[in-house]
Amino acid sequence: VLELHTFSSLNPEFLPLYQGVLAPADEKWVYYSPQAVAHKKLPALGSEDVRSAFGSAVRVFDNKEELETALRNTGENNAVVMMSSGNFSGLNFDELFASY
């Protein structure tokens, strides 16, 4: 899961630079917080903007609870890579992955 968190990564004009970066991943997930976009006073960012940059196979999350539910449903024996300069809106990884 890649979190878009920095000023540049949340900027719709910067997003095309991500083209192909998740290509090696079996599943491609991207998370961003609309609240972070608003807090940074950046132009609105939509799921389609993200999908256009990363490709149609990407699963886009803009809601922490939906991301958490999806992560809980990944099942055992899966490697999940979390990449961010942020904190996934405060997601508690110890609790989330405690059963694994």
Locations of the language-model features?
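ATP-dependent carboxylate-amine ligase
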Residues: 1-100
